[in-house]
């Protein structure tokens, strides 16, 4: 059997939730969209069932999957519905929809609901994706408030640069949000992972923990308060010694500078490892760091082995405990979200 494995450490997930909940205060949504950032939404949700105040997803299908698996917690649809007919499923499965534009608002208000719905009303405080502009927010809020079909309204927005403290953008967005919601009653939600960790003023009634929930610092590097949940590993299935000036891999982009011991490992870009990861990207053999050499192939890659490192059959960590996923992402010119969400053709093992 091909030895590409993903370990999901559910104990680390629970640890991270507790840390983030303590830091934020109030209530905390566990963001499990995109199959819990590649970790497995159902398994992660059940691991957090006795801790989480609620969950957040991106799509109706993601919410339905949690409900049909037995999750009874509040589930927020962060993007709301994509067509008016989806409000039927919102009601059937007791989901909390975000409303971030006029057609979503009108479709919700024109429907005859059997039971009142809790709405998350989004403001575009400066990211300019979805949400009502601050000068339009009060009228959208008033329309919902006047409806007999609306149970309550959570006011929320999303930060564009919370992981870039020096930008000043988060302060601008918070000011816009506070001015636009002045005098409007109800709960609020502003803090994503970066804000939970670093911006106390953004910690309102509800936090939304995504990346940090899975043990990854949104600021790059590592955060000693968090424990990585995902560990991606494989094994060496081939080994050889190459002479100096030997090319390796497609395009012959890497040449050995000396007699070099190399290992061939079972993971490639078809498994989700980024093809653009350059030579010198870190991996670890039995806990000792080494590097990728040559281009990433579809199904395999080549690593350098020193004289002290074991070879054939030994484990190679691609990211997890020894290899920080942020380091891999930075080397490949991408972000850890993309790496985790792209993993496939791997065996998943869940560790309680």
From Swiss-Prot:
BP term (GO), one: D-alanine biosynthetic process
Tell me which family the UniProt entry assigns to this protein. Belongs to the alanine racemase family.
| Function statement | Catalyzes the interconversion of L-alanine and D-alanine. May also act on other amino acids.
Q: In the Enzyme Commission scheme, what number(s) does this protein have?
A: 5.1.1.1
Q: List the SUPFAM superfamilies.
A: Alanine racemase C-terminal domain-like, PLP-binding barrel
> One cellular component GO annotation, for this chain's record?
cytosol
Against Pfam families, the record matches this protein to: Ala_racemase_C, Ala_racemase_N
| Gene3D superfamilies per the UniProt record, alphabetical | Alanine racemase, Lyase, Ornithine Decarboxylase, Chain A, domain 1
Q: Which residues form the active site?
A: 33 (proton acceptor), 250 (proton acceptor)
> What's the domain of life for this entry?
Bacteria
Annotated CDD domains: PLPDE_III_AR_proteobact
Per UniProt, what is one GO molecular function of this protein?
alanine racemase activity
Give the residues the record marks as binding substrate: 129, 298
This protein's name? Alanine racemase
């Amino acid at each position: 059997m091909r030895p590409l494995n993903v370990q999901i450490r559910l104990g680390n997930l629970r640890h991270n939730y507790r840390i983030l909940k303590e830091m934020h205060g109030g209530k905390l949504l566990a963001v499990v969209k995109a199959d819990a950032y590649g970790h497995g939404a159902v398994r992660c949700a059940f691991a957090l069932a006795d801790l989480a105040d609620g969950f957040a997803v991106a799509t109706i299908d993601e919410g339905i999957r949690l409900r049909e698996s037995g999750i009874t917690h509040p589930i927020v649809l962060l993007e709301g519905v994509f067509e008016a007919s989806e409000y039927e499923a919102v009601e059937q499965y007791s989901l909390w929809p975000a409303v971030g534009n006029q057609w979503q608002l009108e479709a919700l208000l024109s429907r005859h609901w059997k039971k009142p719905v809790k709405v998350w009303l989004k403001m575009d405080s400066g990211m300019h994706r979805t949400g009502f502009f601050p000068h339009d927010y009060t009228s959208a809020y008033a329309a919902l408030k006047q409806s007999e079909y609306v149970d309550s309204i959570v006011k929320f927005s999303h930060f564009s640069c919370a992981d870039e403290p020096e930008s000043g953008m988060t302060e601008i967005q918070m000011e816009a949000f506070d001015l636009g919601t002045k005098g409007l009653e109800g709960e609020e939600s502003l803090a994503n992972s970066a804000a939970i960790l670093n911006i106390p003023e953004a910690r309102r009634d509800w936090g939304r923990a995504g990346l940090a929930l899975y043990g990854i610092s949104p600021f790059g590097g590592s955060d000693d308060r968090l424990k990585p949940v995902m560990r991606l590993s494989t094994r060496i299935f081939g080994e050889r010694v190459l002479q100096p000036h030997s090319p390796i891999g497609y395009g012959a982009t890497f040449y050995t500078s000396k007699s070099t011991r190399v290992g061939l490992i079972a993971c490639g870009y078809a498994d989700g490892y980024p093809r653009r990861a350059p030579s010198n990207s870190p991996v670890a053999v039995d806990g000792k760091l080494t590097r990728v050499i040559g281009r990433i192939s579809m199904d395999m890659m080549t690593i350098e082995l020193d004289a002290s490192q074991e070879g054939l059959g030994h484990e190679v960590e691609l990211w997890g405990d020894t290899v920080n996923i942020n380091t891999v992402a930075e080397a490949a010119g991408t972000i850890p979200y993309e790496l985790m969400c792209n993993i496939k053709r791997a065996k998943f093992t869940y560790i309680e």
